[in-house]
Amino acid sequence: MTEHGTGLLLVMMDIDPEHEDDFNRWYDDEHVPERMAIPGFLTGRRYRAIEGGPKYLAIYEMESPEILDSPAYKYASGQGRSEWTAQVVGRAKNYVRNVYVEM
């Protein structure tokens, strides 16, 4: 495993205020731990916008962007998704997801 990765996954979104508690519980208790269990994911951090939006940002450092093509990631983001994940993701608004590679 490398000391730092060459890939970043950034995900931004808004959630209606009445769903924020559930969203934050899901992110902290289920989603980030699931992602961090995937080989090649190195760090996962969450941020809240001080102003502007989208309000929520998650940044995942990966060994490389190719991790997103791995069977483990494809399973976790496909048929391995929980009902809770489907529910929370279905409430997301202004969803932005970008993958970056170090230059």
Walk through the language-model features, giving the residues of each.
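Macromolecular interaction modules
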Residues: M1-M103
